[in-house]
Amino acid sequence: MAPNLRKSHPLLKMINNSLIDLPTPSNISAWWNFGSLLGICLATQILTGLLLAAHYTADTTLAFSSVAHTCRNVQHGWLIRNLHANGASFFFICIYLHIGRGLYYGSYLYKETWNTGVILLLTLMATAFVGYVLPWGQMSFWGATVITNLFSAVPYIGQTLVEWAWGGFSVDNPTLTRFFTLHFLLPFMIMGLTLIHLTFLHESGSNNPLGIVSNCDKIPFHPYFSLKDILGFMLMLLPLMTLALFSPNLLGDPENFTPANPLVTPPHIKPEWYFLFAYAILRSIPNKLGGVLALAASVLILFLAPLLHKSKQCTMTFRPFSQLLFWTLTANLLILTWVGSQPVEHPFIIIGQLASLTYFTILLILFPIIGALENKMLNY
């Protein structure tokens, strides 16, 4: 009998072991769809991004006009740009849900997979930030100015660091050029990191909603989960296309329709919606260095998740108190997102500070305590 090419060819064998004959737990729910959705997001973003880069000019005098030209004169340029801008939002929706799934079901106990995932999140955030600067509108310019300025909070070398990042004494042409370079480069880095992420995942195999070893009951990835993933793609592409075609500017900032002007500061500088929770945490501390440290900690805290797991059970499926805490954390993040979009005025300042405190308290203190408490309850 002739050998099956799919199983013997060096390249096809790798694809086969990752996407076709991969043993997969039979009970994984729709929450396990987001990994493949993130893959689709990345592919879409790279494709639309390459097409946009072909028409973009990384120069302060031409950047804004080149984006307008793409939307007006390039075949379907408006659609490509709208898909790219809103695709970023869907990328973040998927990654936040993916991380939420990981926290809920204890996937962080697969340490290598989890840590590469957090590095992926950081790289994605960097990519989105530098990408937002490229259209060179008012919010692009002032967002870049405010966020890069945070490096000046680093003791001793801060100011040097900022000027080195800017390539001058303010955000200007060199800054735009290097941001374009980074925005082009980082997605390919994300691709590489994704392969590492998947390599680590396939070492241990997938987690499942029960959090128990499922080796005795695994099924091939294809056709079961390949079909389920295609359903997921459809359900994501539908709202993405709806947003891109019906209200493409819904999630953007109207300030970005005005070309960048260093002499006029927008009344309220704020990042895109997916960074608002971190921005709220940054603003809630009245000290610059303290704010920067809190901002960094708000994301880097994910690295600590495996160390803070005190429960005897992997998932939260049978842990009602941890579940309550998890959904409180979710609500808290939504409050932070809302506060980040509001001006720095009386009620919002204190709400932001309380929400920031709650965020760190839940993750660092309450989760381990409740986990240990639930272990005690197992004895009764």
From Swiss-Prot:
Database matches in InterPro entries: Cyt_b/b6_C, Cyt_b/b6_C_sf, Cyt_b/b6_N, Cytb/b6-like_sf, Cytochrome_b, Cytochrome_b_C_euk/bac, Cytochrome_b_N_euk/bac, Di-haem_cyt_TM
Requisite cofactors: heme b
Chain sites annotated for binding heme b b562: 84, 183
Pfam families the record matches: Cytochrom_B_C, Cytochrome_B
Transmembrane segments: 34-54, 78-99, 114-134, 179-199, 227-247, 289-309, 321-341, 348-368
Entry's Gene Ontology BP terms: mitochondrial electron transport, ubiquinol to cytochrome c
GO molecular function, one term: ubiquinol-cytochrome-c reductase activity
Record note on cofactor: Binds 2 heme b groups non-covalently.
Keywords (A to Z) from UniProt: Electron transport, Heme, Iron, Membrane, Metal-binding, Mitochondrion, Mitochondrion inner membrane, Respiratory chain, Transmembrane, Transmembrane helix, Transport, Ubiquinone
Membrane topology label: Multi-pass membrane protein
Location in or out of the cell: Mitochondrion inner membrane
GO cellular component, one term: mitochondrial inner membrane
Chief subcellular location: mitochondrion
Binding site for a ubiquinone: 202
Domain of life of the organism encoding this protein: Eukaryota
Mitochondrion in keyword set: yes
Binding sites annotated in the UniProt record for heme b b566: 98, 197
Summary of subunit composition and partner proteins: The cytochrome bc1 complex contains 11 subunits: 3 respiratory subunits (MT-CYB, CYC1 and UQCRFS1), 2 core proteins (UQCRC1 and UQCRC2) and 6 low-molecular weight proteins (UQCRH/QCR6, UQCRB/QCR7, UQCRQ/QCR8, UQCR10/QCR9, UQCR11/QCR10 and a cleavage product of UQCRFS1). This cytochrome bc1 complex then forms a dimer.
Function: Component of the ubiquinol-cytochrome c reductase complex (complex III or cytochrome b-c1 complex) that is part of the mitochondrial respiratory chain. The b-c1 complex mediates electron transfer from ubiquinol to cytochrome c. Contributes to the generation of a proton gradient across the mitochondrial membrane that is then used for ATP synthesis.
Miscellaneous section: Heme 1 (or BL or b562) is low-potential and absorbs at about 562 nm, and heme 2 (or BH or b566) is high-potential and absorbs at about 566 nm.
Listed PANTHER family: CYTOCHROME B
Name of the molecule in the record: Cytochrome b
Source species of the chain: Antigone rubicunda
